Amino acid sequence: MQDENIETWHILFPDNELAEFLRENNFVERYGYKFIWRNKSYDNFEDYLNIFKSRQRKNIKNERKKISELDISFEIKDMKNLTNKDWDDFYIFYKNTYEERLQRPYLNTKFFKYVHECRADLRPVIFFAIHKNKKIAGSLCFQSNDTLYGRHWGSLYNIDSLHFETCYYQGIEY
């Protein structure tokens, strides 16, 4: 990696074989927390809500209601209908969210273009939040046959409950 001038290299969710290979080759394994949601045969979002106590259900419904009352809707784009413009829009949201926290985004437009043009096998899905016919936020996920991996998100505005709706609830409904 030094020959390539690479400072760090991160692999998210390696399968068991790759994880073992990395350990055997002295890569450092990082342990952290992650949220994994499992669909336990829920037919819809309401079924999912029924696992919670009444107060928790009410809180989630109130969060979703806030977004709905702001007239924010959602558009789901996958590899079949993602365009270069969609990737450009997502990058603007992603970059803005980092810059608001005085940080530099660690992924650049080249990465997103590469995913779009060369890595259809990752099966990207972007959940776009729409307000007044304009995209205002997005959450990027990758999918396998039975798993939706979410990690990247961004928004133009700091709107209460928008992060959870875009990153979690939309993915659960999907």
Give, region by region, the residue ranges found by the protein language model.
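Ampipathic, surface-exposed secondary-structure segments
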Residues: 142-143, 147, 168-174
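A conserved beta-strand-loop-helix scaffold within acyl/acetyltransferase catalytic domains
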Residues: 2-160
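Conserved acetyl-CoA-binding loop-helix of GNAT-fold acetyltransferases
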Residues: 1, 159-173
